[in-house]
Amino acid sequence: MLEEKAKDLGRQIGQSTEYQALKRSNDLLTEDVEASTVLRRLTQLRSEAQQFIERGEDPPPEMEQELDRLLQTVEINPVYQRAIVAQTNFDKLMVRVNEYISEGIRTGAVSKIITLS
């Protein structure tokens, strides 16, 4: 019963406009060569900067400048902006879903009636 309801919830989330918009925007972001290249480089630089920090060192100023430049580049990309908006909207949906689940758990925890359907 619980597994069925969870799968149904997952199916409904997958059919939601928020998820569909997220999927479309991520597909477009993947297809955008410039944005993908910048995002890969950002990920690489962040990882390298983290290694410096873990060693107790400051990342070189050139690295910080490149990170800033890449962030500015990607933040003005309309495909990236749509992906961020879609992710934010999906995150809001998932927060609401989690609130509904928590509410159901609280209600179920105090209920003396056991339902099997």
Predicted regions and their residues:
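Terminal, compositionally biased segments used for targeting/anchoring and flexible tails
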Residues: M1-S117
